[in-house]
């Protein structure tokens, strides 16, 4: 998943974990037309993580629709706190995930 030159000879597992720990993830709510709410997840490096696969995982766990585009994940509805819990379960450090109210 990671480029070998970025790891400096570290094992891929350690390099991948370091990459996850460096992510600063912001979760916010955006109001759209007709009062619809969309949860926006930003700050995940799309070069290191497959955003479409992560979006698919979140959509199935939350039973909602959504998409991954423009370097961010958009989920239909207000799922800010549940998304944070799922991202922590997937290995992202809780202190690097911010919910913007």
Swiss-Prot record:
The keyword Protein biosynthesis applies. GO terms for molecular function: mRNA binding; translation initiation factor activity. PROSITE patterns: SUI1. The keyword rRNA-binding does not apply. It comes from the Archaea. InterPro entries: DENR/SUI1_TIF (IPR050318), SUI1 (IPR001950), SUI1_arc (IPR022851), SUI1_arc_bac (IPR005872), SUI1_dom_sf (IPR036877). Keywords: Protein biosynthesis, Translation regulation. GO terms for biological process: formation of translation preinitiation complex; regulation of translation; translation reinitiation. It holds the Pfam family SUI1. Belongs to the SUI1 family. This is Protein translation factor SUI1 homolog. It comes from Aeropyrum pernix (strain ATCC 700893 / DSM 11879 / JCM 9820 / NBRC 100138 / K1). The lineage of its organism: Archaea, Thermoproteota, Thermoprotei, Desulfurococcales, Desulfurococcaceae.
């Amino acid at each position: 998943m990671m480029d070998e030159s970025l790891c400096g000879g570290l094992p891929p597992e350690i390099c991948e974990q370091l990459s996850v720990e460096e992510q600063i993830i912001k979760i916010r709510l955006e109001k759209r037309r007709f009062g619809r709410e969309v949860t926006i997840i930003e700050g995940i490096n799309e070069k290191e993580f497959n955003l479409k696969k992560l979006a698919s995982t979140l959509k199935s766990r939350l039973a909602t629709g959504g998409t991954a585009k423009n370097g961010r994940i958009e989920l239909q509805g207000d799922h800010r706190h549940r998304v944070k819990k799922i991202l922590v379960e997937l290995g992202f450090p809780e202190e690097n995930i911010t919910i913007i109210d």
